[in-house]
Amino acid sequence: MAAKRKTGFTLIEMIIVITLIAIAMTGITAALYPRSQQSAEQVLAVKAAELGRAVLDEVMGRAFDENSGPNGGVPECVLVATTGRETCTLPSKLGFDKDENANTKTLYNDVDDFHGLTGSVKDVLGADISADYQRYNVEIKVFYEQNNGGVMTGQDAATITDYKRISVVIIDPSGNRYPFAATRGNF
């Protein structure tokens, strides 16, 4: 009578298979890790772009200057003192008007009221929405822009011009800076 042969795996064969699977899993994980990191960075960038556009839209929705008219800036403020017309705000006076501060955003009536605003994210009504944008920060700078023969330079002008540059920088939780800018005309 012939002896039955036993079937199955030996302990050594099982250890070899486990080792090969571990090596394969390590290689696959190492190949996929950079992609997951890039994916997270893209999510932060998209969120920053969304926030930057919203902040810029909020600022651009205001009048050119506190001395401009309420109907689309008509009558517009003037660069040089003229009888019967309001002069635009001096470059040194850009920023909060009287009775305005960082906590009274609903009182902002012109773009330069946002000048120097920094910190966590607040909506149009001044409510804190930093829960939706955790660890995101906003920096806003408004200045008169130099106009070199119809070409906007993006540079700060020392005198009043017909153009204000609104510069918004969004800083994401990783510290990456996302700049946004627009020019508002005095028309």
Regions found by a protein language model. Give the residues of each.
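Low-complexity, Gly/Pro-rich coil/beta segments used as flexible assembly/activation regions
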Residues: 46-50, 56-187
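Aliphatic-rich helix starts adjacent to a transmembrane/signal segment
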Residues: 5, 9-53
